[in-house]
Amino acid sequence: MKKNDLSALQENCFCFCDEEISREAPFQVPIDFPEGFKVDTAEASAAVTWSTDNLSCISEPCLIQTGPEPEDIGVRYAVRVQGTITLLVSVSPVRNQYGQGDGAVSVIHTEEIDQVVYYAAQSGRCPDFSQITVEDLLIVPPFYGSPLTVAGTLVLPPSPDPQSYVFTANTGDSTVSVIDADLNTVVKTIPFSDVPTNLGVTFDKAFTYVLHGNTNLVSVIDNKTLTIINTITVGGGPRKIEFDPTDEFAYVMAAGSIYVINTASQSVIDVIPIPGALDFALDPNGQYVYTANGSSWSVDKYDVNTGQLVESIIDTFEFPSLITTPYAGNFAYVLNGELWPKGVTEISLSPLSRGGDFSRLFETLRTIVFSLDSTRAYFLEPYSEPFLINNLYVVNTARQRIIANVSLPGAFDLAVTPDKQYIYAAQPNDNAVTVYRTSDYTAVTVIPVGAGPSAIAM
């Protein structure tokens, strides 16, 4: 944002988005009983119904810092819910002084609401009030003259759009940075006792699995609460993770094997030996694992249900070291070459066979990333000045042709938005993530993260 634009916003009383988000509103409702009637709190239960007729939503523009420079300012909207919620609180059973009867006492209570429930990129993104819930309902017995009280928490609805996060594994300070993809700012930093070296997000965006390559551990982050909820033991040096399209299983490459994790129980249920493999990829249907075998110079195909090697491409590759499959399609890209430069070959997954080679040779590739619709692939070479400046190659997968070659300085890993409009590039030497617009591959914002981000996922 230009300085004069920023000044105009500040003159219009635009403040920074610093009000804390809260979707919870606790309440306490005292209950008075008619003379001669009582309730036994040991057996009593409470019920609550509510009306949101007097509740409203407003969008308040505010400012966020989008980059390291003072003029790197953007506008977001604080979504504020305000007004009143009318509660009908009931307690039962209510009995007379002789212990007879099975009635109930109800009280109408009005709860004031005035709080920011989330920040949005656009105005008018109000929540659905029908999704309001009540949690932690509790009956508090009378105490020193105070009446019986029903306490609980109103939980206000989340954003109508699913929250989208970008995660970076920061090897320099053993943290994971969580970036709000709407705000393009870090909203949480999660510390670990072991170094995070790679990570992956389930397709339903519910969980992030963090690999600790210096140990034999995989940590699980709940993406709703952004907290670590479990640690799973696998083989030593876990280096890559992929998920089947149903999110039923996660596959972790470690110690010369694939460790199959049941995501419901978050436990290892099978181990598939993959001797000689330097890399692996799961087919789009989640039925087969394909490995780049640096020992036998082959691409091997394993059935994930039986763990058996079922097919191989042999005697056609020279030291295959990287393999990547798209989200949809019957092909994969294989980086191969014992020395430098190296080539990329397209293979057919079924039947397993070698296809054509890309005409361009590469120093090496750090990663190959596909767009969600699988129409684009992004080949990332190491960045080196002044010899290797244009280090990103954009591929039209239908034509197997490079359609762009641009510069992403210092990029070590990539994540592509589902609509293909932006690329998030992890830059470990700068402790930052740069967001590039794919229409012209210009940087639109720089996001400071933890030290040494070496892997990124969204």
Swiss-Prot record:
Organism: Bacillus subtilis (strain 168)
Record Gene3D superfamilies: YVTN repeat-like/Quinoprotein amine dehydrogenase
Highest classification ranks of the organism: Bacteria, Bacillati, Bacillota, Bacilli, Bacillales
Gene it is expressed from: ywhL
Protein name stated in the entry: Uncharacterized protein YwhL
Signal peptide: none
InterPro entries associated with the record: Host-pathogen_enzymatic-act, N2O_reductase_N, WD40/YVTN_repeat-like_dom_sf
